[in-house]
Amino acid sequence: MPLSTSLLGKKSTYKDSYDVTLLFKIPRINNRNELGINSNNLPFYGVDVWNTYELSCLNKNGKPWVGVGTFYIPTDSENIVESKSFKLYLNSFNNFVVESVKELERIILQDLSNVTHAKVTGRIFPINTKVEFGVPSGKNIDDLDIVCNNYGAPDNSLIEYEDVLVEEEINSHLLKSNCLVTGQPDWGTIVIKYKGKKLKYDSFLKYLISFRNCNEFAEQCAERIFTDIKNAISPDFLSIYIVYARRGGIDICPYRSTDKSYTLPSDKRFIRQ
């Protein structure tokens, strides 16, 4: 189904009853082909973490319940879910009666698994769950005094390295791109951990800033950055985690790693979530 038939970028009416058909799938293979990624032999492992903040239903007495959800879509799923369709789908539960929160969780996980063709995991939390904010791990490179003049398209030629081997973690809050269809800004904090030739911080920061006017989905931006770093320095280990700011009641946080037994860098929200 072409992206032009989705609800993204169009005026939409919220359904007042549960409707799984609102979920719009996008094959990962389309964007991966553009990046030269073989979908049958992925160079990474990982997940897309979706945090959802507009989640409500009715209990058996008709009383509303509200909560938040976190869902993990495996990076080897056949499809991703278009974000606006997911928002509309979640809001279709607003007047839907469920026996329990566990039942709501089961329905959503099953629907997401069916649409993505993968085993989606996750959990729904009560609205009064205590939340702690975290900060990205590693060295922040944002205060470097650099001159930037490339905002047209991501430029991987900006990635330079030193002929010395390191194992380190760096981060930046200056990643920004735009939604492929609506053009709305996606603001991201990126955490990069790697073992290999040392990235030159100044040139790498320029590379990240070159995404500023790029029109791509969050997942594709993550895989482009992963691929560009991998091609530039051939690291023994590489992971990237991008935590995007909340937009439309959802934030998307792609994680990619060369390590099959990966663990996410942080389970705490950053301040822009």
UniProtKB/Swiss-Prot annotation:
Where is this protein found? Answer: Cytoplasm
Q: Which GO terms describe its biological process?
A: queuosine biosynthetic process; tRNA modification
Q: Does the keyword Cytoplasm apply?
A: yes
- The main location is cytoplasm
For this protein, the record's SUPFAM superfamilies field holds: Tetrahydrobiopterin biosynthesis enzymes-like
Q: Which GO terms describe its molecular function?
A: preQ1 synthase activity
The residues listed in the UniProt record as binding NADPH, with positions renumbered to this chain, are: 83-84, 247-248
Give the domain of life: Bacteria
Q: Does the keyword ATP-binding apply?
A: no
Q: What are the record's GO terms for cellular component? A: cytoplasm
Q: In which pathway does it act?
A: tRNA modification; tRNA-queuosine biosynthesis
Membrane spanning residue stretches: none
Under catalytic activity, the entry for this protein gives: 7-aminomethyl-7-carbaguanine + 2 NADP(+) = 7-cyano-7-deazaguanine + 2 NADPH + 3 H(+)
InterPro entries the UniProt entry points to = GTP-CH-I_C/QueF, NADPH_dep_7-cyano-7-deazaG_red, QueF, QueF_N, QueF_type2
Where in the sequence is the active site? 179 (thioimide intermediate), 186 (proton donor)
Question: Which enzyme type, at the first EC level?
Answer: oxidoreductase
Which EC number applies?
Answer: 1.7.1.13
Record Pfam families: QueF (PF14489), QueF_N (PF14819)
Provide the alphabetized UniProt keywords: Cytoplasm, NADP, Oxidoreductase, Queuosine biosynthesis
Residues given in the record as substrate binding sites: 81-83, 218-219
HAMAP family reported for this sequence: QueF_type2
Share what the entry says about its subunit structure, partners included.
Homodimer.
**PANTHER family hit by this protein:** NADPH-DEPENDENT 7-CYANO-7-DEAZAGUANINE REDUCTASE
Write out the function statement from the record. Catalyzes the NADPH-dependent reduction of 7-cyano-7-deazaguanine (preQ0) to 7-aminomethyl-7-deazaguanine (preQ1).
Q: What's the family?
A: Belongs to the GTP cyclohydrolase I family. QueF type 2 subfamily.
The protein's name is NADPH-dependent 7-cyano-7-deazaguanine reductase
What is the species listed in this Swiss-Prot or TrEMBL entry?
Answer: Rickettsia conorii (strain ATCC VR-613 / Malish 7)
